[in-house]
Structure formats: C-alpha cells, structure tokens
Amino acid sequence: MRDPCQVILLAPVLLLLHVAEEAPGFVTWFNNLVADGITLQLFAWANGAGYLITLFVAMLLAGSRETAAALIAIAWLGFLMLGNSMLHITATLALGRYAPGVITSLLLYLPFFLWFFARSLDHFRLRCTTAMAVAAVGALPMLIHGYFIVFEGRRLV
C-alpha cells in the first residue's frame, strides 16, 4: 500500500500500540517530574480523545482523498506522532532513563509519520515547505508541553 489515503487507517492502531507501551508506567513517570501530576483517569481520557480524533482524521482522509484532508492529517500526525516522539526521545536523553512510550515512538510513530509525510508530498503534489510548516504548527503544542514537563517540571494544562 503506497496510497496515504489507505495507510492513514493504520494510525489509530499505532496509537493503541503506543498507549499500550505507555500505560503501565506513564502516570508514575509523569508525576515524578511534574508537581501537579495527572491521574490514570486523565491519562485515559486524553488518550481516548486522541484516539477518536485520530480515527476521525483517518476516516476523513480515506473517505475524501482531498488535499485539505491530507493537510489536516499532516497537522494532526505532526502533533500526535512527531511532537509526541520528540517528547519521549528528548525526555529519555535529557533524563537518562526510559520514558514510557519511547520505544513505539522510535519504532512506529516516527517511521510512520515520515513515510506518510513523504508519500503525501508525492500523492497530493504538496510543496515540501508548506507540508513542513503544517507539521510544525501541528507539533508545536506537544513540543511546548514536552519542554514544560522535562525541563520545567510543569504541564501545559
């Protein structure tokens, strides 16, 4: 499958695999870094909302096959996969210990995002600079949130 309009349907599955890696230890890991921690319920709610958005974006692109839907997908995956991967990788390197989610970030999220991005450029004839800007804007909230968690011990919201 080379068509990003079909492969996007894997994104919800990848999110579930990522959450399966995070779930056993993320709340404890997070709460050891951030004074105003999170509960397991908040973790579940945030990931449930993320799953529903991912499902919606995947179905939107698969159903419409429109350039606008591809840009929405690039923005969302920029947040979900690119930004989230940067959070996990940066945390692991900066703190010198495993950040729950880093394995699926490296093995699933980053390769999928980069593949989807590259295929979307070709398939939708997107300008690379435009697609990069869309992905960067999408990733920005997660990058800011990650910075606050890892380097300031606080959360964005």
Question: Where are the language model's segments positioned?
Answer:
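Interfacial loop at the N-terminal end of multi-pass membrane proteins
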Residues: A20-W45
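N-terminal signal-anchor transmembrane alpha helix
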Residues: R2-E21
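Membrane-interface helix caps and helix-loop-helix hairpins in membrane proteins
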Residues: I89-P100
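Membrane-interface helix-boundary motifs at transmembrane edges
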Residues: M1, L60-L71, S120-T130
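Terminal transmembrane helical module of multi-pass membrane proteins
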Residues: W115-V157
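Core segments of transmembrane alpha-helices
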Residues: N47-L61, M81-S85, Y109
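Aromatic-anchored segments of alpha-helical transmembrane domains
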Residues: L16-A20, G78-L87, G138-F148
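Alpha-helical transmembrane segments in multipass membrane proteins, preferentially the mid-helix core
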Residues: N84-A91, L110-H123
